[in-house]
Curated annotation (Swiss-Prot):
This is L-lactate dehydrogenase. The keyword Glycosyltransferase does not apply. Homotetramer. It is an enzyme of class 1 (oxidoreductase). Belongs to the LDH/MDH superfamily. LDH family. NAD(+) binds at V15, D37, K42, Y68, G82, L83, A121, S122, N123, T146. The lineage of its organism: Bacteria, Pseudomonadati, Spirochaetota, Spirochaetia, Spirochaetales. The gene is ldh. GO terms for biological process: glycolytic process; lactate metabolic process. The keyword NAD applies. Substrate binds at Q85, R91, N123, P124, V125, D126, D151, T152, S153, R154, T231. It comes from the Bacteria. GO terms for cellular component: cytoplasm. The modification Phosphotyrosine is found at Y222. Pathway: Fermentation; pyruvate fermentation to lactate; (S)-lactate from pyruvate: step 1/1.
Length: 316
């Protein structure tokens, strides 16, 4: 008998429901999706709405409202619950409030007997991923955050628009905090087989343009929040990408929130931060400790140190 893959989603807000929708229409290998939320009517409504579209799907998926007991035999628990950014707030402003929420959620999930993989999308995601690891006492490779996957997708979109190519032909990453201290790996960026440094040397793009592009990545969430109140479609797709990489054992490289403990120059230890990593059925197979330029390494140090300063203030 074939194994039935089961995912539990904790949080039926904009991000959670966008992920649930993306997963449902993706024809993935997930067979069962359980949705949990304190706002039970909201969660039940999302379940009903998704189920009413089953006729239009290539493959039906069992979707139900549930509780933490349903986590006991789940392969993956996705957490999107928590307070969202308000206009004018940074992601780091949410640390104290969401840490309290996560303590209750994570301990409830673990109490069910869950032994699968956590995927965290709540902000500030790098810190909430660390909080999940601490409260669950899970191995670090079994706790994953969405990290800078969304930031990287935004960057590749902007680069693709600028160079008039498909996003699949852009090879570049945003690393560091999913937030204001992130940085672009310009020195390693390629458009298909051609390095960005070659375009700069030829005068086909300028450093000023690239700086503006990174500012647009950093400010994207603030702009979307100002216009529509929250971001959820793109991150919903990002979570789905991570979940499918785990379920399908893809060995896919994504800039997720990974546990760093001495990589990239041994300058900061014991944090989660956005770094390209191999995602497989066991979670994080490997954090890719590849060489980045000195100027980018300095930005990574600054970003990591900022996250570490917040983590050190949390009492576990």
């Amino acid at each position: 008998m074939l194994k039935r893959n089961k995912v539990v989603l904790v949080g039926a807000g904009g991000v959670g429901s966008s992920f649930a929708y993306a997963l449902t229409i993706d024809n993935s290998l997930v067979h069962e999706l359980i949705i949990i939320d304190l706002a039970q009517d909201k969660a039940k409504g999302e379940v009903m709405d998704l189920n009413h579209g089953q006729m239009f799907l290539e493959k039906n998926i069992k979707i139900e409202f549930g509780n933490y007991d349903d986590c006991s035999d789940a392969d993956i628990v996705v957490i999107t619950a928590g307070l969202n950014q308000k206009p004018g707030e940074t992601r780091l402003d949410l640390v104290g409030k969401n840490t309290k929420i996560f303590k209750e959620i994570v301990t409830s999930v673990v109490s069910s007997g869950f032994s699968g993989i956590f995927v965290i999308a709540s902000n500030p995601v790098d810190i909430m991923t660390y909080v999940t690891m601490k409260y669950s006492n899970f191995p670090t490779h079994k706790v994953i955050g969405t990290g800078t996957t969304l930031d990287t997708s935004r960057l590749r979109y902007f680069l693709a628009e600028r160079f008039n190519v498909n996003t699949q032909n852009i090879h570049s990453y945003i690393m560091g905090e999913h937030g204001d201290s992130s940085f672009a790996t310009w020195d390693e960026t390629k458009i298909a087989m051609k390095s960005l440094s070659e375009y700069l040397a030829e005068g086909k793009v300028s450093d000023a343009e690239l700086d503006e592009m990174h500012k647009n990545v950093v400010n994207a969430a603030y702009e979307v929040i100002k216009l529509k109140g929250a971001t959820y479609y793109a991150i919903g797709l990002g979570i789905k990408k991570i979940v499918n990489a785990i379920i399908s054992d893809q060995n896919l490289i994504l800039p997720i929130s990974s546990y760093i403990n001495g990589q990239y120059g041994n300058f900061v230890k014991d944090i989660y931060i956005g770094a390209p990593s191999v995602v497989c059925k066991d979670g994080i197979k490997e954090v890719l400790d590849f060489t980045i330029s000195d100027r980018e390494l300095e930005k990574f140090k600054i970003s990591a140190s900022q996250l570490k300063s917040y983590i050190d203030k949390i009492e576990f």
